[in-house]
Amino acid sequence: MILLEVNNRIIEETLALKFENAAAGNKPEAVEVTFADFDGVLYHISNPNGDKTKVMVSISLKFYKELQAHGADELLKRVYGSFLVNPESGYNVSLLYDLENLPASKDSIVHQAGMLKRNCFASVFEKYFQFQEEGKEGENRAVIHYRDDETMYVESKKDRVTVVFSTVFKDDDDVVIGKVFMQEFKEGRRASHTAPQVLFSHREPPLELKDTDAAVGDNIGYITFVLFPRHTNATARDNTINLIHTFRDYLHYHIKCSKAYIHTRMRAKTSDFLKVLNRARPDAEKKEMKTITRKTFSST
């Protein structure tokens, strides 16, 4: 299985090139790039007001207001410091870099810029991991509508944090492959007792979402992660956040890859069958033809 990159490579490569050229004393060039990411996220890299010595990185998330309710603004201030500026129009967060005043730790700064989406997501997880660490119970469940028709729920208890993703499968094939995929996670936990518990429910929401407006339907699935203190403590939580916030994309990416692989194998097998059939086909009988005088000749 393939782990999706947590960082955004386009941001990192663009900023790294800009920093490298600036450090070499090269004349700055204009940049204007707009590109998308998973979960309807949109990025914009540009020169604000046409100033080529400044590079702005902006991100738009449809669900950012829900993240703000869980401390997203405070977390971003802590991570990005003075690079965080007022967001440009149409975006939720903007970072500004001055090519005439390069930071000392350029590699670290570039990497953190590439982690912008992850860091926006991180606030809700850090908040509930902290609740669990402090033994708080009864806090309201976090509800993040991270896609138009899909939702993430986060809830903390004294001994665990429960994260539930709802997801929509486009067709019956996706449901079948998704079930097989989730079964592999259950098998994986048997091999590693330190892995979190992973549960999958189809059509109906899990008990954790009882008496909520969670969606119900033949194409609806729910993936539940039960995270224990070994997954949420201060040393492990960053890696946990890195992995869990991309899980929905990871699942659907592998469903698409599986369907493409099956389709490729079917085409290859069909081609092999056709070759066998062509070899087994009998040669056409040669028809003997004669002239009016009964002499034989062959047609060409």
From Swiss-Prot:
Keyword Acetylation: yes
Record-level Gene Ontology MF annotations: actin filament binding; AP-1 adaptor complex binding; Arp2/3 complex binding; ATPase binding; glutamate receptor binding; kinesin binding; protein-containing complex binding; structural constituent of cytoskeleton
UniProt keywords, alphabetically: Acetylation, Actin-binding, Cell projection, Cytoplasm, Cytoskeleton, Nucleus, Synapse, Synaptosome
Gene3D superfamilies: 3.30.1460.20
InterPro entries given in the database record: ARPC2 (IPR007188), ARPC2/4 (IPR034666)
Chief subcellular location: cytoplasm
Subunit structure: Component of the Arp2/3 complex composed of ACTR2/ARP2, ACTR3/ARP3, ARPC1B/p41-ARC, ARPC2/p34-ARC, ARPC3/p21-ARC, ARPC4/p20-ARC and ARPC5/p16-ARC. Interacts with SHANK3; the interaction probably mediates the association of SHANK3 with the Arp2/3 complex.
Protein name, as recorded: Actin-related protein 2/3 complex subunit 2
Organism: Rattus norvegicus
